[in-house]
Amino acid sequence: MTTIPSTAEAKLEMLTTINRAIAGSRPEALPPYPVPAPLSRAEILHQFEDRILDYGAAYTHVSAAELPGAIAKALGNARRVIVPAGIPAPWLTVGMDVLRDEPPLSHAELDRADAVLTGCAVAISETGTIILDHRADQGRRALSLIPDFHICVVREDQIVQTVREGVEAVAASVREGRPLTWLSGGSATSDIELVRVEGVHGPRRLQVIVVG
């Protein structure tokens, strides 16, 4: 009669076998982390613009004085714009139907809005990625996931060159337990037959406005 070992015995036997197999082995040294050659400030800004446009997102670079007009222009005929509590008042212009997320808007209200306007935590030129850590100028995650059009304002001094620098920039947010959202262009996905569908996991359209 065959005796079937218990689950605990089977696990112990498996782990013992693995332990014996690796007992005499030595872990290989990790290869050095590839570090790209440092870019000048102008090169970082150009690289970021190039990546953003490559994703099919829109890109504008303006001065602080030009920012409100750039936001209004990006909105076009869209006027119902959701803004988090921490958006600076000077960013908003007369004529906008501002929907403040105070108290929190319902998902249906977010879906009916024309656009959402946020700031960001940091942006990465190497990958054209924008990271939100959902502080006051970015709002809760739903704001940047449900509306179909996201206008994101990025200060020049928030743009770093590498992913490593970007991760370091939000390390404190991670320690605080804050959620992070990483954006690289508008939302898009493809099925197994490579049929591209936009807007499945977030806004279809992304407008990046760099200010500085």
UniProtKB/Swiss-Prot annotation:
Query: Which is an annotated Pfam family here?
Result: LUD_dom
InterPro entries recorded: FTHF_cligase-like_sf, LUD_dom, NagB/RpiA_transferase-like
Please describe what this protein does: May function in L-lactate utilization.
Q: Could you say which protein family the record assigns here?
A: Belongs to the LutC/YkgG family.
User: How the protein assembles, per its UniProt entry?
Assistant: Homodimer.
- Its recorded name reads Lactate utilization protein C
- This protein's species is Deinococcus radiodurans (strain ATCC 13939 / DSM 20539 / JCM 16871 / CCUG 27074 / LMG 4051 / NBRC 15346 / NCIMB 9279 / VKM B-1422 / R1)
The organism that produces this protein has a lineage beginning with: Bacteria, Thermotogati, Deinococcota, Deinococci, Deinococcales
